[in-house]
Amino acid sequence: KNVAVNIGAERARYEAQTRIEGPGADVKMYSLTVAEESQEFDQRTIQIHNAPNAVSDLLFKNALLDKSRSIFSGLIKVAEGAQQTDAYQTNRNLLLDPTAEANALPGLEILANDVKCSHGATTGNVDETELFYMMSRGIPKRVAMQLMVFGFFEEVIEKVESDELAENLRSLIRNKFETKIS
């Protein structure tokens, strides 16, 4: 299991490659990225399945403020002999400013015929209906937006096995967004 956190650099490139060589292997890759101002994050992943009956699961989440930008390029490669592969690749992007940008290029290269593989990417803004609902319950807009961002990242944070590290991540994200979301 791998959990990556991208927050501080002006420009950063993150590359991760998993190579599954043993039957029954189970690989998990998670990432959360908070980008602001003119930060750029380039994320590239490859999940290579060379053995049968193996699982890989990738979930990358990005929240983008200001003029920040993210690029996700992911590939699941399944070799001919890697039957019964179960592989997933998901990239989700939350645009918090109209000038923020997210680009995603998920891909599959499958040479085996008995597999369950999927990939997907979504990019969107804060759901206005959800925001309206929270505000109609007396929650100020700024707090409602912050709660939605925290909820967006919680799916990745809950994968962190150390409670102390998970709490530190929550604090880091909370501090990052307390002044940025209006």
Where are these regions (language model features)?
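Small/polar glycine-rich anion-binding or flexible loop at a beta-alpha turn
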Residues: 127-130, 146-155
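Small-residue helix-packing motif on alpha-helices
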Residues: 25, 144-145
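Conserved beta-strand/loop scaffold segments within soluble protein domains that form the structured core
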Residues: 1-132, 136-139, 160, 164-182
